[in-house]
């Protein structure tokens, strides 16, 4: 008799539901992980709304914290019963992209029957959980290429302390790294959702001494101060570009980090840059972007625009866990709610509609 599990599956645009599915069978290079905590991401909401196409019946979610239930015959150095995380991006490190230093793009492109952009192709990169294979909002998940992607959780750290590592922390910190921040820099971070808050914390770790956090939610701006912001601006109460330019004496910021994914925030991120400044783009854009020439000076202002997808792999996860374990960053304030997997539909409703001050929801299968 086939062993079954509960999983949150994509049914159709606007509908994710809890269903019974077989517990995955693993191959020699895989691991079966029993999920103890996972969460819902903004990208999952894009899937729910039909803005990003996935197969019907696919288990969604890509942020796993759990316990190794079973190891493939070729996986060494781990043990059953060990607490682990895996990155949202699970590269196998065999592709040209990975060997060329961009492991998050491992996997390149797969045809999607014209359902999305990229000239009829679906950009998958190394994002497999909840995209190309069943994801983590379930009782169990198959972790592919486990040798390259499983990272042990140190004793003394809770699930909630490491829950941001697989995606939100990795993405936000990459935004700070890609901003080319130098010691003493001034940085503007546009949007203080979970990724933007992590970018704010990352900018502080990278050496920025003046961090300007921008959002339209005062509660999130309060949390941004805890993450390291020196100045907070509510865009509902001011002209953000004018305020940033005043704060910098008309010079502009050394770097800006765009963490929302809208035309407006992208433009503002450009307009506040000093000549030669760097825009680090993290937002998930749902439509084409227009780059306004008026946001540039001659020679396009010598500006640099860097983009990034969430880095994955066990070494990246190990480094992020080191930061958490050191106490230099505490992301506990980002976990605002907890739901059982049985109540995943209600959790999606809360998260998608951004009620009750929600930032991240810890989803517990048991």
UniProtKB/Swiss-Prot annotation:
Its cofactor is Zn(2+). It catalyses: a primary alcohol + NAD(+) = an aldehyde + NADH + H(+); a secondary alcohol + NAD(+) = a ketone + NADH + H(+); (R,R)-butane-2,3-diol + NAD(+) = (R)-acetoin + NADH + H(+); an aldehyde + NAD(+) + H2O = a carboxylate + NADH + 2 H(+). GO terms for molecular function: (R,R)-butanediol dehydrogenase activity; alcohol dehydrogenase (NAD+) activity; aldehyde dehydrogenase (NAD+) activity; zinc ion binding. CDD domains: NADP_ADH. It comes from the Bacteria. Induction: By limited oxygen supply. InterPro entries: ADH-like_C, ADH-like_N, ADH_Zn_CS, GroES-like_sf, NAD(P)-bd_dom_sf, PKS_ER. The keyword Phosphoprotein does not apply. Transmembrane segments: none annotated. Its EC number is 1.1.1.1, 1.1.1.4, 1.2.1.3. Zn(2+) binds at residues 41, 62-63, 167. Binds 1 zinc ion per subunit. It is an enzyme of class 1 (oxidoreductase). Keywords: Metal-binding, NAD, Oxidoreductase, Zinc. Gene3D superfamilies: Medium-chain alcohol dehydrogenases, catalytic domain, NAD(P)-binding Rossmann-like Domain. SUPFAM superfamilies: GroES-like (SSF50129), NAD(P)-binding Rossmann-fold domains (SSF51735). Multifunctional alcohol dehydrogenase exhibiting NAD(+)-dependent dehydrogenase activities for 2,3-butanediol, ethanol and acetaldehyde, and reductase activities for acetoin (NADH-dependent), and diacetyl and acetaldehyde (independently of whether NADH or NADPH is the reductant). The rate of oxidation of 2,3-butanediol is much higher than for the oxidation of ethanol. Has acetaldehyde dehydrogenase activity leading to acetate formation. May function in the release of excess reducing power in the absence of exogenous hydrogen acceptors such as oxygen. Homotetramer. Belongs to the zinc-containing alcohol dehydrogenase family. PANTHER family: NADP-DEPENDENT ISOPROPANOL DEHYDROGENASE (PTHR42813:SF4), ZINC-TYPE ALCOHOL DEHYDROGENASE-LIKE (PTHR42813). This is Alcohol dehydrogenase. It comes from Cupriavidus necator (strain ATCC 17699 / DSM 428 / KCTC 22496 / NCIMB 10442 / H16 / Stanier 337).
């Amino acid at each position: 008799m086939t062993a079954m599990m509960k999983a949150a599956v994509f049914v159709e645009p606007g509908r994710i539901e809890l269903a019974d599915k077989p517990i995955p069978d693993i191959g020699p290079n895989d691991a079966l992980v029993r999920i103890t905590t996972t969460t819902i991401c903004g990208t999952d909401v894009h899937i729910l709304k039909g803005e990003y196409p996935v197969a019907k019946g696919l288990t969604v979610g890509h942020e796993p914290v759990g316990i190794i239930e079973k190891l493939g015959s070729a996986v060494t150095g781990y043990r059953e019963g060990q607490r682990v995380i895996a990155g949202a991006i699970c590269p196998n490190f065999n592709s040209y992209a990975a060997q060329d230093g961009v492991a998050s793009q491992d996997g390149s492109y797969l045809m999607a029957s014209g359902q999305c952009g990229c000239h009829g192709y679906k950009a998958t990169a190394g994002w497999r959980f909840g995209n190309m294979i069943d994801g983590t909002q379930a009782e169990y998940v198959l972790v592919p290429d486990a040798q390259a992607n499983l990272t042990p959780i140190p004793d003394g750290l809770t699930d909630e302390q490491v829950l941001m590592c697989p995606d939100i922390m990795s993405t936000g910190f990459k935004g700070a790294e890609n901003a080319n921040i130098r010691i003493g820099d001034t940085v503007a971070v546009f949007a203080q959702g979970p990724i933007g808050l992590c970018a704010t914390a990352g900018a502080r770790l990278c050496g920025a001494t003046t961090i300007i956090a921008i959002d339209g939610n005062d509660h999130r701006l309060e949390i941004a101060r805890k993450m390291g912001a020196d100045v907070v601006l509510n865009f509902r109460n001011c002209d953000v570009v004018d305020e940033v330019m005043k704060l910098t004496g008309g010079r502009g910021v050394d770097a800006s980090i765009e963490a929302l994914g809208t035309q407006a925030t992208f433009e503002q991120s450009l307009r506040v840059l000093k000549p030669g400044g760097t825009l680090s783009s993290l937002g998930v854009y749902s439509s084409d972007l227009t780059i306004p020439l008026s946001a540039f000076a001659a020679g396009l202002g010598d500006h640099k625009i860097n983009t990034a997808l969430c880095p994955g792999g066990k070494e990246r996860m190990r480094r992020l866990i080191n930061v958490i374990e050191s106490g230099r960053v505490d992301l506990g304030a980002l976990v605002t709610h907890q739901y059982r997997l049985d109540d995943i539909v209600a959790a999606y409703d809360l998260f998608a509609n951004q009620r009750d001050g929600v930032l991240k929801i810890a989803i517990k299968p048991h």
